[in-house]
């Protein structure tokens, strides 16, 4: 999308640069980072700035801290980043306090400073202009490379851009790549274009489904959200997840698909169990005959075969949402198999972030996918056709 100001359009030579990254990475109970994909994704932009003789200030949030706590510190991120870049990272003890400001002022060309968790400042999530002004005062150039938070109007994402003119703000390589992939997917997909949509709730994906229907050739609906559609068709779904208030909307989507000539595929069988737990009995049952007191927790083998057939001739596949409760091993098979089939084909495969990216990583298919988005919510909102606040803030005024 050429109307977004890119990092390449900016004269960075020897400037002090602020890069908003998305280092919101999962950690275990000992605060060890369990997946550093988001950190690795930021490296091309960081290296580009270093190659241009910049001094670099990095900023990110981590989790949703209610107060300042070592549990949410970016210290582990600094260590991992130092290892990945093979370079010392200066760590600030705060965000806009004396320590951060002193270290920012003394930062020399080729050095990197990582600020402490942005959400330790209450103003961050309120899009507070005073916080934004303090952050902006540390640098000459602002780069946003945090696609995962672009759908949020936060201080370090939106308000901060008001303090930089078009020659001094832009999108990093990761953000540009994310926007380009989503834009091409919606505007110029190679056909047949198949969307595979799962996850637990219809409510979270309703707008995306509505926006996708006129653009796709086929739509596969799996995961917990499929049961609202199956119920809308009059099937017995037992105790499976149901959003009763959305039955009418589900019917509308099915009707709209039919009117547009888009084939919509739902599970034909499911893995059912009396409870969502690893140590309960399970059985394969037809999707329309889930026994009372049982719930569907994954797609069954017949559904896996059907969905494999549906995507076999696809040229473009967009996948957002697991096919079952993949966190529990015995209900993860459908999601893992879908990951294998999508990655093995010749289609351009775009994976929406969040849980779907976790499934792909667990299946060992990450390297075979064309593109894995780093942002679940942001990716979904782009597909819904929404303008993301963080992206809008980087548009060139000439193109508005």
Curated annotation (Swiss-Prot):
Binding residue positions for substrate: 22-24, 38, 61-64, 119, 152
Record-linked Gene3D superfamilies: Phosphoglycerate kinase, N-terminal domain (3.40.50.1260)
Record's keyword terms, sorted: ATP-binding, Cytoplasm, Glycolysis, Kinase, Nucleotide-binding, Transferase
Pathway in which the depicted protein is active: Carbohydrate degradation; glycolysis; pyruvate from D-glyceraldehyde 3-phosphate: step 2/5
Pfam families: PGK (PF00162)
An example molecular function term from Gene Ontology annotations: ADP binding
An annotated GO BP: glycolytic process
InterPro entries: Phosphoglycerate_kinase, Phosphoglycerate_kinase_CS, Phosphoglycerate_kinase_N, Phosphoglycerate_kinase_sf
Superkingdom to which the source organism belongs: Bacteria
Keyword Nucleotide-binding: yes
Full protein name: Phosphoglycerate kinase
